[in-house]
A protein has these predicted regions:
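Acidic, low-complexity, intrinsically disordered interaction modules
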Residues: 9-66
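Short intrinsically disordered terminal tails
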Residues: 1-5, 64-68
């Protein structure tokens, strides 16, 4: 299995998020996720833009917060 086949996927009736390796995450997605996370959870969050774990964790925390 190559790296491109690995992904995290969350799905519910409101949204589907499928995020691959960091090179597969668009800068627009990162910007929007960062904006929402700062508004809803932590204004001081400044992720490493190349750390996929930062974004996966942010998605997980938002899903928990909004009970998605």
């Amino acid at each position: 299995m190559g790296n491109k086949e690995k992904f995290i996927s969350y799905e519910n009736e409101w949204m589907t998020v499928r995020v691959g390796y960091i090179r597969d995450i668009s800068m627009e997605f990162k910007d929007e996720l960062e904006r929402i996370y700062k508004e809803e959870i932590d204004i001081n969050w400044f992720p490493n833009r190349w750390c996929k774990a930062c974004y996966y964790d942010a998605i997980r925390r938002l899903i928990i917060k909004f009970d998605l």
